[in-house]
């Protein structure tokens, strides 16, 4: 894929002179890759969940050349500063045999709830770089499991 990704970032200063909220838009230039169709026929439940074709969410270029499902993180934070882990639950749901949301951020020790909203077996295989890998079968619709990355 030949293309250039440009970041347009906006900084909004919070109450502290040294803290800021970061938001922005990621633009794609060049020829957008063709969407890759996902074959849902391996599981009849998944196939019947969709009346329209399903496409992979790996690279999604919107009509205005912005990218969907982009995550930007700050690799090195403020020196000498530590911040508490947000207590709010991050939810990863399997709906229509697709993960929702496709991309999300989570901090160390922040709870992740993994849900299966489908009436079929799903497998969730987490492969974090720094912590223990997990591979969970979720055979029951409505099933919920909670994990933390430490």
Which residues fall in each region the model found?
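Positively charged n-region of N-terminal signal peptides that target proteins for export
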Residues: 1-9
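Hydrophobic alpha-helical segments and their boundary regions
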Residues: 8-9, 13, 98
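Sec/Tat signal peptide C-region and signal peptidase I cleavage site
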Residues: 13-19
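Extracytoplasmic copper-binding redox domains, predominantly the cupredoxin/blue-copper superfamily
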Residues: 19-150
């Amino acid at each position: 894929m030949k293309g250039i990704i440009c970041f347009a970032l906006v900084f909004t200063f919070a109450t502290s002179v040294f803290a800021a909220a970061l938001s922005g838009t990621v633009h794609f230039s060049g020829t957008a890759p063709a969407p890759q169709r996902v074959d849902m026929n391996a599981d009849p439940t998944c196939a019947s969940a969709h009346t329209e074709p399903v496409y992979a969410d790996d690279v999604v270029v919107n009509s205005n050349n912005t990218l969907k499902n982009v995550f930007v993180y700050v690799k090195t934070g403020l020196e000498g500063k530590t911040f508490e882990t947000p207590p709010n639950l991050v939810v990863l749901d399997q709906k229509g045999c697709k993960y929702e949301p496709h991309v999300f951020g989570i901090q160390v020790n922040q709870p992740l709830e993994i849900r299966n909203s489908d009436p079929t077996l799903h497998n969730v295989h987490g492969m974090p770089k720094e912590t223990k890998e997990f591979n969970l079968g979720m055979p029951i619709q409505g099933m919920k499991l909670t994990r933390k990355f430490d």
